[in-house]
């Protein structure tokens, strides 16, 4: 406990002192109602909505509640109409005892916004109790020597009612010797005394019986009676006299049973039996008598435990009686001292165990504290721990509200165990703790968050449909339906991208699937956005960028751009016989639609008519000579080259290259007949045979002179016709060969053009000299060279 008390100054503390209560009462006017006790249940006390100044329906919508001290429901509120009804009969004497006025405090609490209203119901007393004497019979012993005017105390009657309904007067039945006088104590209670009017004579009348009546002030009046039996004794001159008529003593309430309280003392001047004094309790006041007295010594002890919270003062009337029956009376005023024997009590009036996370200053609990002790023992300190986002706010009449200090964050902390500590200021301090559990309810205040800011995924082309490519994942810090995420494909920025035909997504787990086979050569990569939406209301969403990269497969063989591979007439390259070793004949140009290493091409010479004469550079496809040409080398050569990529599996293409060795570029040339296809060669041979036969037939029909003339003409025409049929189709020889890669297919010094015109039955070769700057002095010579045309008829068999 000491450790806990040491921590209290470090906590948020709210001191609730009596002065605070008084200030609150003075500044906050309570709504007061009054009604008589014992009113039948169902009685309408008032219309609460009207008295509070709010609409009738507002009581229901704002969750109006009534709280009472002690948690006993005395009233019932109809929130729809605002009427306040009595739930049961109320007994003022049971609820308030002798306290006047009898005020029942209750609080009305409204929510949204939180409001408190202090309300009081005062119960007025009705005369529903009659006076009652503690004994049905009283015994008095009066000596016959008593003088008129002598006063004899009588026991008072008790009436549970208060005010005018309590005992107001005492009477005695008519007689010759006594009358009753009614006196008031300091607290207003009435008590009777019997006054002797006429001297008594024991020999004439040894006994008397009187009827003592107690009357209250109600209308109609109620009464109670007791019998007073008087014995007249022989002369007893002196009655006992107490040393003090009033004894005042203070007794702590925690004194044990049989604890000593005080000693009273009385003396009697008579001698003998008339001087012997005995002590007794004359009359106790209250429900029970917690004291006993020793009849010989006059010592008063506790017979029951005292409780300051129930009765703080006791007035004990002590009677001292001598042997002759005379008595004297004194009063012992016992003040019960409060000790800190009651721990503070905490009563939860309203509790909200589920608090929305985004609400500020939400009332979590309404509670009241009380301590039955007084003074510092009843002053209290109320506190909660520092490290939680909650505050304690005092309202009124020992009421507090526990509110959130600001908006809570369920994602940071979903549950709080709040310990409310109430300590009094007594010695030693007593402490009461109450722990409430507050759960933070989720609000959809967090959008889904992707595990990556962007995603890059790879898929090989020629994939199978429905292939699982990858998974997009998002999380939501909320809970329940607020954290349930659905995924979707967002419309692409590129309207030409048919995303719905390429990709699909599983709405529940974010798995991406390919809808069809992808082609790297058609689409290398594409981007799109994936959205994640939670199930809250309103729903929150986020999106992330997904970049899909199509990986190339080696599904394309190299494609040769040059030389053109045409089934009708392959291309022929010219090689000067005087070419030096390393002479560039041509360059094989090829491409591969694949990418990366699948498009890395290499060249290889597979086969050649003269293997040692030619070589191919592996990386650029240049075909060069490896040595000087000799007279023994053939004039025509056929090379078979292989172009292959670096993929897996490897793909390749073959290139056939024809090389014609010429003495110089100044000589006319034609491709050999053998370079044509075999089917065309066969056709040419048949045609030649027919022309020879036709020429022989015509020659035999003419005279020798005519035959010679005509024969020469016919032979020339036949040969021209034959050469015309052997002509190569136009366009098979590129007019200007340009190195696509920039390395140069032909030597920069030689650009040539071959034109074969079959329509004129002549073969024309146009040779272009190397391009050199033409000086003015050379203009004429250059002009003559430009007009040079050579006409030759050359046949290859």
From Swiss-Prot:
Residues 1-30 form the signal peptide. Residues 31-691 are extracellular. Residues 713-797 are cytoplasmic. Keywords: Calcium, Cell adhesion, Cell membrane, Glycoprotein, Membrane, Repeat, Signal, Transmembrane, Transmembrane helix. It is found in: Cell membrane. One of its GO terms (molecular function) is calcium ion binding. InterPro entries: Cadherin-like_dom, Cadherin-like_sf, Cadherin_C, Cadherin_CS, Cadherin_N, Protocadherin/Cadherin-CA. It comes from Rattus norvegicus (Rat). The chain crosses the membrane at residues 692-712. Glycans are attached at residues 169, 276, 417, 566. This is Protocadherin-3. Residues 35-133, 138-242, 247-346, 351-450, 455-560, 567-670 form the Cadherin domain. It is a single-pass type I membrane protein. GO terms for cellular component: cell-cell junction; plasma membrane. SUPFAM superfamilies: Cadherin-like. Gene3D superfamilies: Cadherins (2.60.40.60). CDD domains: Cadherin_repeat. One of its GO terms (biological process) is homophilic cell adhesion via plasma membrane adhesion molecules. Potential calcium-dependent cell-adhesion protein. May be involved in the establishment and maintenance of specific neuronal connections in the brain.
């Amino acid at each position: 406990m000491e450790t806990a008390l040491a921590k209290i100054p470090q906590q948020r503390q709210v001191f609730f002192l009596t002065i605070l209560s008084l200030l609150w009462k003075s500044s906050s006017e309570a709504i007061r109602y009054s009604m008589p006790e014992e009113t039948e249940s169902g009685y309408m006390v008032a219309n609460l909505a009207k008295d509070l100044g709010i609409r009738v329906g507002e009581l229901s919508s704002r969750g109006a509640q009534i709280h009472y001290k002690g948690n006993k429901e005395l009233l019932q509120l109809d929130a729809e109409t605002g009427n306040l009804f009595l739930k049961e009969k109320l007994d003022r004497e049971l609820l308030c005892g002798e306290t006047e006025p009898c005020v029942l405090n209750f609080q009305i609490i409204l929510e949204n916004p939180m409001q408190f209203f202090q309300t009081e119901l005062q119960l007025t007393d009705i005369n529903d109790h009659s006076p009652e004497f503690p004994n049905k019979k009283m015994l008095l012993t009066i000596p016959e020597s008593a003088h008129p005017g002598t006063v004899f105390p009588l026991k008072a009657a008790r009436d549970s009612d208060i005010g005018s309904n309590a005992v107001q007067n005492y009477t005695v039945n008519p007689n010759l010797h006594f009358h009753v006088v009614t006196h008031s104590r300091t607290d207003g209670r009435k008590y009777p005394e019997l006054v002797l009017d006429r001297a008594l004579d024991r020999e004439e009348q040894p006994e008397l019986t009187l009827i003592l009546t107690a009357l209250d002030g109600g209308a109609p009046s109620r009464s109670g009676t007791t019998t007073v039996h008087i014995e007249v004794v022989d002369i007893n001159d002196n009655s006992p006299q107490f040393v003090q008529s009033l004894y005042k003593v203070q007794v702590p309430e925690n004194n044990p049973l049989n604890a000593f309280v005080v000693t009273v003392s009385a003396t009697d001047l008579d001698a003998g039996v008339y001087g012997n004094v005995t002590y007794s309790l004359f009359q106790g006041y209250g429900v029970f008598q917690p004291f006993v007295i020793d009849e010989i010594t006059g010592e008063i002890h506790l017979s029951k435990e005292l409780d300051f919270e129930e009765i703080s003062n006791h007035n004990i009337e002590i009677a001292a009686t001598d042997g002759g029956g005379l008595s004297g009376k004194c009063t012992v005023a016992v003040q019960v001292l409060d000790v800190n024997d009651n721990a503070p009590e905490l009563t939860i009036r309203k509790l909200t165990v589920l608090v929305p996370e985004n609400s500020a200053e939400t009332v979590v609990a309404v509670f009241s504290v009380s301590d039955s002790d007084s003074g510092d023992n009843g002053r209290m300190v109320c506190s909660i721990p520092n490290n939680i986002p909650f505050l304690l706010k005092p309202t009124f009449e020992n009421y507090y509200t526990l509110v959130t200090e600001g908006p809570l964050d369920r994602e940071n902390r979903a549950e709080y165990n709040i310990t409310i500590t109430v300590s009094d200021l007594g010695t030693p301090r007593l402490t009461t703790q109450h722990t409430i559990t507050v759960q933070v309810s989720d609000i959809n205040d967090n959008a889904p968050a992707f595990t990556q800011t962007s995603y890059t995924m790879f898929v090989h082309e020629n994939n199978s449909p429905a292939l699982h490519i990858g998974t997009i994942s998002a999380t939501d810090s909320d809970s329940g339906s607020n954290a349930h995420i659905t995924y979707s494909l967002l419309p692409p920025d590129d309207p030409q991208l048919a995303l719905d035909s390429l990709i699909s997504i599983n709405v529940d787990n974010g798995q991406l699937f390919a809808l069809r086979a992808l082609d790297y050569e058609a689409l290398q990569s594409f981007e799109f956005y994936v959205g994640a939406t939670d199930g809250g209301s309103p729903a929150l969403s986020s999106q992330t960028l997904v970049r899909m990269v199509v990986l190339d497969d080696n599904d394309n063989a190299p494609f040769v751009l040059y030389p053109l591979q045409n089934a009708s007439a392959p291309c022929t390259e010219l090689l000067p016989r005087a070419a030096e070793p390393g002479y560039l004949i041509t360059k094989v140009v090829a491409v591969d639609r694949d990418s990366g290493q699948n498009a890395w091409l290499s060249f290889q010479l597979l086969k050649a008519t003269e293997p040692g004469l030619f070589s191919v550079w592996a990386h650029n496809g240049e075909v060069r000579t490896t040595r000087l040409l000799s007279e023994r080398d053939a004039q025509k050569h056929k090379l078979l080259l292989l172009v292959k990529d670096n993929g897996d599996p490897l793909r390749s293409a073959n290139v056939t290259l024809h090389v014609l060795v010429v003495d110089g570029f100044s000589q006319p040339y034609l491709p050999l007949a053998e370079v044509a296809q075999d089917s065309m060669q066969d056709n040419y041979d048949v045609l030649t045979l027919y022309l020879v036969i036709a020429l022989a037939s015509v020659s035999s029909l003419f005279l020798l002179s005519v035959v010679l003339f005509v024969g020469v003409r016919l032979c020339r025409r036949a040969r021209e016709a034959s050469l015309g049929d052997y002509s190569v189709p136009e366009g098979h020889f590129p007019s200007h060969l340009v190195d696509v890669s920039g390395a140069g297919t032909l030597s920069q010094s030689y650009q040539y053009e071959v034109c074969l015109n079959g329509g004129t039955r002549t073969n024309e070769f146009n040779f272009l000299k190397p391009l050199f700057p033409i000086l003015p002095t050379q203009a004429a010579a250059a002009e003559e060279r430009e007009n040079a045309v050579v006409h030759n008829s050359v046949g290859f068999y």
